Amino acid sequence: MTQPLDDAASAIFGPRLELAQCYADWLGTAGVERGLLGPREVDRLWERHVLNSAVIGELLDHGERVVDIGSGAGLPALPLAIARHDLQVVLLEPMLRRVEFLQEVVTDLGLAVEVVRGRAEERSVRERLGGSDAAVSRAVAALDKLAKWSMPLLKREGRMLAIKRGASSR
């Protein structure tokens, strides 16, 4: 990392920076090997993936329940869970190989994060995860489709936070 990235990472992750580094290591090795992240992304893991995901924590209140729709390799929710360990984070992912990767990472890092295999549009998922404070996602689908998936998972005042094309939108 460059000095500005070091400073940003320290500011965002504080005493949990080492956990964030371990997650970045997972992404750069097993994440690439298992096809969850392209090999060209390794050089920009921190700037484009880890930090870009963690900063949405500024939009969440203490202790909120957050569902990551289509977690994939754990972005944005794992950096968010590392930076904001007060949050109740649920990773929602339909693909078994990704779920297995996420469970391995969560266990290895000792994170209090729930991994659920399923799709947001499934009735059982809506019943289990409905009433959440926020739904987050990163490069999952068009916003209109994402809104259809997110709304049933949210409580009345809930928020959908989507990271699209390198920028965070609310």
Swiss-Prot record:
Enzyme class at the top of the EC tree: transferase
Keyword S-adenosyl-L-methionine: yes
A GO-annotated cellular component: cytosol
Family annotation (Pfam families): GidB
Key words of the record: Cytoplasm, Methyltransferase, rRNA processing, S-adenosyl-L-methionine, Transferase
Subcellular localization(s) per the UniProt record: Cytoplasm
NCBIfam families to which the protein is assigned, alphabetical: rsmG_gidB (TIGR00138)
Protein name: Ribosomal RNA small subunit methyltransferase G
Species of provenance: Mycobacterium ulcerans (strain Agy99)
